[in-house]
Amino acid sequence: MASTFVCSLPNPFFAFPVKATTPSTANHTLLGSRRGCLRIKAISTKWEPTKVVPQADRVLVRLEDLPIKSSGGVLLPKAAVKFERYLTGEIISVGSEVGQQVGPGKRVLFSDVSAYEVDLGTDARHCFCKESDLLALVE
């Protein structure tokens, strides 16, 4: 998931020397400078999910993978699966104001409306939600 992308594109107007009737240093400095280039650097940061500590009454939940097949064996398209209103997942870490019933390792059911999904740079999907937004503990 973590990737590095670097792209350099030269400006085509400065690729060839410009002939001027009078010698000008401006034309020569633009040929060798990087002002005529576009440089993009996108670096994704990777965090260890167990080391991320939520604040106050928030919990960090690792989402379970959505089903690819229905119970009857029919393949489900992603468009049909992504609009599920209720999600289940495993609690990874909890904030300091969370009660004793909710702790790391427990499975919970919650609504996707109240969850804030984050990308921690791993293959798994994670989200933050409040303890009061948890609907049920799943045994």
Curated annotation (Swiss-Prot):
**Keyword terms, alphabetized:** Chaperone, Chloroplast, Plastid, Transit peptide
Write out the annotated subcellular location. Answer: Plastid, Chloroplast stroma
Q: Signal peptide: which range, if any?
A: none
Q: Which PANTHER family match?
A: 10 KDA CHAPERONIN 1, CHLOROPLASTIC-RELATED, 10 KDA HEAT SHOCK PROTEIN
The transit peptide of this chain lies at 1-39
Which Gene Ontology terms describe the biological processes this protein takes part in? Answer: protein folding
- Recorded protein name is 10 kDa chaperonin 2, chloroplastic
Say which species the protein is native to.
Arabidopsis thaliana
The organism's place on the tree of life at top rank: Eukaryota
Q: What does this protein do?
A: Functions as a co-chaperone for protein folding in chloroplasts.
Asked whether the UniProt record includes Hydrolase among its keywords, one would answer no
